[in-house]
Amino acid sequence: MKKIINIGIVAHVDAGKTTITENLLYYSGAIKSVGRVDLGNTQTDSMELERKRGITIKSSTISFNWNNVKVNIIDTPGHVDFISEVERSLNSLDGAILVISGVEGIQSQTRILFDTLKELNIPTIIFVNKLDRIGANFNKVFEEIKKNMSNKVVRLQEVYDVGSKAVYIKKLFDTCIINDDAINVLSDLDEAFLERYIGGIEPDKEEIQEKLSLYAREGSLYPVFCGAAAIGLGIEDLLDGICSYFPFASNDCESDLSGVVFKIERTSKNEKKVYVRLFGGKISVRDKIQVPNKEIAEKVKKINRLENGGVVEAQRIEAGDIGILYGLTSFQVGDVIGISNDKIKNISIAKPALKTTISAIDKEKNPELFKALTLLAEEDPLLAFAMNDIDKEIYVNLFGEVQMEILSSMLDDLYGIKVEFSNIETIYKETPKGFGASIMHMQEDLNPFWATVGLEIEPAGRGEGLRYISNVSVGSLPKSFQNAIEEAVIKTSKQGLFGWEVTDVKVTLSCGEFFSPASTPADFRNVTPMVFMEALYKAQTVLLEPLHEFELKIPQNALSKAVWDLETMRATFDNPIVIGDEFSIKGLIPVENSKEYKMKIASYTEGRGMFVTKFYGYKEASAEFSKARKKTTYDPLNKKEYLLHKLNAIRD
């Protein structure tokens, strides 16, 4: 059975990863000519929008063969606004290639990606690209990597005539030079190796290469390659490195079925394509696959497999490989197929922190816009959106302005809907202060429904989200009614007392009664929001604001300015640390206050400063800070208005 490696290529914008992908395919023989980003004819940027803009938006999957190893490769977006695409890709990888431009060096996005790969222990090769460009400096970038990312890096090549088209490379192991980087890193990682070296036993090249391969596959060290993908320099060395320094995927077809959905697309005929990375077992055409959290199974109608630059139809896929499955209409990105295991990584890099209103310029197309967003959200679950029940405005959560531009172009190109955005705001949340309880009895007071519901609300731990518990047995309240209550609780929690989503909350169903001839799930669905909001009102809520974890690096002469800015933005941070000729400051900062700070730093440090942020979570805002939001549904706290709306809807 052929060995398989599933790898991803990640990088900051314009580091050249799509060009690297094209050259890997070309030098491995998978394609006959190299596509170019500027000509819009690359293999992986298949969306028309990607070709027009020259950037990767959706992760693409393609394969090639090298040294009798099948390599499935995912080319991911580089812009931070498409971090959700990168996030999903990482769940499927055996290894990652992190591309850094030899001209621009380490960027904020580079640090975010590397820290995530390190945290998830994904074996990583670093490739320093664009060494043919004027201004490129490999030695400087390598020292930046050691200083700012990891000292467990090993340079495997020497490069000459950098910054010109005459640039060329020599493998260190093709010369008589014993690599000091390798000796130092291996001495740190391998006690037996260190003892022999101190004892005067000089390691040979074969031993060093064997040890480097072992520890790279564990994710303990990072091989560094270099080149210029635009002219094909360094690509064959990188191909060898993929097979030498990444672990092979498990091919245990006899184990229990285990896989993860990492991507969803639709064909021109609107047929759903489910991309699956299989970690164990096998899937064949006509197999029935259990849908997570649902009591249904769906039949696999067709399977496509990646094969040497193309896609071929197959009867089955086996452990270690990537397959494209047809017929699984209910599966979503992130769903586990079969059983979960420790290889299915729990990834959370970022969450959208901005919310905006979106509408069709031709208002009559707003219903079509809602349908189009529904289809796009199927491919990107972090594209959360909702419609205001009162004025029918549509709200969408986003990472930033570039994603907003791309979403606008996609809606125009794919669905013929021109849109406009307004009222961009930061997403806050709220959480209960204390305990609150409420009960509404059927057909009493303001409850016209055949349903009795009692709820208790209290704080949960930070980061727990919404925890729902039923203390009512299915014997006394049927499952269909209990499901309706839980669904209504989840839906109503999207807007609390301040209008923001209620989180870190424990909701307990304390009471539930029905009247056999008359009660329906709709009765419970309609009465629950009033009970929930009344209990929440008694508990009261506090505002939670989103925070970014940050690291700020600035020249020493900019320290006082940086500290003043951070204090003004309500950041909390540790004492500055001197690193060489720079100061490094780490801490937490409100998202609302730091949105434009990267541009400001670039200005006052003349491009020498670096501000790296990563979504941290939500924290209770200070008591004097308030940020209410207009309700987008009829407020169940105003029972008369809410009931009037519900009863009119029932009559209609």
UniProtKB/Swiss-Prot annotation:
Domain named tr-type G: residues: 2-252
Protein's UniProt keywords contain Glycoprotein: no
Domain of life: Bacteria
UniProt binding sites for GTP: 11-18, 75-79, 129-132
InterPro entries: EFG_II (IPR041095), EFG_III/V (IPR035647), EFG_V-like (IPR000640), G_TR_CS (IPR031157), P-loop_NTPase (IPR027417), Ribosomal_Su5_D2-typ_SF (IPR020568), Ribsml_uS5_D2-typ_fold_subgr (IPR014721), Small_GTP-bd (IPR005225)
Any Gene Ontology biological process: translation
Short name of any one Pfam family annotated for the protein: EFG_III
One example GO MF annotation: GTPase activity
Keywords from the named record: Antibiotic resistance, GTP-binding, Nucleotide-binding, Protein biosynthesis
PROSITE patterns the record matches: G_TR_1, G_TR_2
UniProt record similarity statement: Belongs to the TRAFAC class translation factor GTPase superfamily. Classic translation factor GTPase family. TetM/TetO subfamily.
Function: Abolishes the inhibitory effect of tetracyclin on protein synthesis by a non-covalent modification of the ribosomes.
Annotated protein name in UniProt: Tetracycline resistance protein TetP
Species this chain originates from: Clostridium perfringens
Lineage of producing organism: Bacteria, Bacillati, Bacillota, Clostridia, Eubacteriales
